[in-house]
Amino acid sequence: MFMATDVEIAQKAKLEKISVIAEKMGLTEEDYEQYGRYKAKLDLNLFEKNKDKKDGKLILMTSINPTPTGEGKTTMNVGLAMGLNKIGKNAISVLREPSLGPNFGMKGGAAGGGYAQVVPMDEINMHFTGDFHAITTANNLICAMMDNHIHQGNALNIDPKQILIKRCMDMNERELRDIIIGVGAKGNGVMRQDGFEITVASEIMAILCLAKDLKDLKERVGNILIAFDKEGKPVYARDVKADGAVALVMKEAIKPNLVQTLEHTPAIIHGGPFANIAHGCNSLIATKLGLKLGDYVVTEAGFGADLGAEKFFDIKCRNDLHPNMVCIVATIKALKHHGEAEDFKVENVEALEKGYANLKRHIENMKKYKVPVVVAINRFATDTDAEIKKLTELVEADGTRAIFCDVWAKGGEGAKELAEYVVENTKEENDFEFLYDLELPIKEKIEKIAKEIYRADGVEFSAKAKKKLKQIKELGLDNYPVCMAKTQYSFSDNKKLIGAPTGFTITVSDFKISRGAGFVVALLGSVMTMPGLPKVPSAENCDVLDDGTVVGLF
């Protein structure tokens, strides 16, 4: 049977002009600025206009530990938002922006799939409204001003061996992880070791996603710890006078982007930090604006619940957000993977039952936050009746509801049962609570996450990490939340330990101090903030035909 690709489905869709979508949301022409026919930037004055309006319900979409191709969080997010609208509710999908790195790498785009996509899919996946370019430019402007300051006499006495900020680009390129700059003649600047991160791991990206407004963004940029001087004192971005120029570069990027789903449900897409090497959530501004404009906001946090959801709750929600439900996305194929099955397309109830331990642990973890939990099974044609029956029994035996959804093939219609469940189970207020208190030292926060969420026996700290812990305390940052950076494929810091491993320890190899963003990143194991391309990158299949038709995106 012929199955159209995601990009083919998106290209055949009949989109409504973004002005029509905006009008349905109750917006006037003064509330947004169009970027072509089908995209717009939302004005931040909407907060003032809607300040007396009650916030809508906030639903988080997360997942089990994924396979390399992902489990369909974005697809389920879009499907649920459309399903809510199908049953007469005013829902908005609020998502992260795709990064070009995975687009051209292994994972592909981040606009959903099948008949549960945000559109125009090709434009969203390729550059969109230019936010990532602004973030990249802003980050690299700080680096350029800092290196120029050193070259022009170094009045701040910056120690070239203690520079913390790295340049960034929105591409997977391992060759740029560690480089030497300033090589050659004296006029080329001071020679020093440097490196690149992918844009989504930069502190500017985190700041965009946690700032309340442009003023807050500018203040946070000024607080970025870029280096230490030769006496060991901190040097900030404001010290090289970069904060004003960076705020100027980010003036338009801070505004959330409005698009639509294939069924014309509004979608706000803004910011895009990865959840394995950053905090993994779309912008606070987008989420809060969605809560003012819709009765239900379906948002997401990257990768598995051990990464994205934990950071959503313990970092993002500390900014006056109260989640009403968490939806864990799982697939039978991924559970069979966690059960060590060799062929995911062949019925294997035994492997499914073994792999269920991964989902079970995520369910238990999410319940620790005192938020209602539902499991959404992203249905595939290869799922058998026996597997469906067994998974339903396993989930319900643990006191949770499992709902099979076919949003890829049916769009919002395939999520109506899930939508009804969400509406019914978000009527009452819950007792949401954080996993840890901010007054705990960073070390104890890490140990709590490791033991409560990952189920590790303990935490080891490298000599480098111990030195940084002392530095963090001296800087007065022990009361910051912690952002764990580790592999997405396992509860542990070893990607080969799939399922629900026990009897392991995690190793904190280093720390990254994100003073402007307002958290401390703990780097676990061998995690890297600049990915590399796979042996056969998806870029090899991407093209544009003579008539402008895009091919190869997924």
UniProtKB/Swiss-Prot annotation:
Binding site for ATP: T67, P68, T69, G70, E71, G72, K73, T74
Annotated metabolic or biological route of this protein: One-carbon metabolism; tetrahydrofolate interconversion
SUPFAM superfamilies in the cross-refs: P-loop containing nucleoside triphosphate hydrolases (SSF52540)
Entry's EC annotation: 6.3.4.3
Catalytic activity: (6S)-5,6,7,8-tetrahydrofolate + formate + ATP = (6R)-10-formyltetrahydrofolate + ADP + phosphate
Keywords, ordered alphabetically: ATP-binding, Ligase, Nucleotide-binding, One-carbon metabolism
Top-level EC class: ligase
BP terms from Gene Ontology: tetrahydrofolate interconversion
ATP-binding listed as a keyword: yes
CDD domains xref list: FTHFS (cd00477)
Family: Belongs to the formate--tetrahydrofolate ligase family.
Entry protein name: Formate--tetrahydrofolate ligase
The species this protein was found in: Finegoldia magna (strain ATCC 29328 / DSM 20472 / WAL 2508)
Gene name for this UniProt entry: fhs
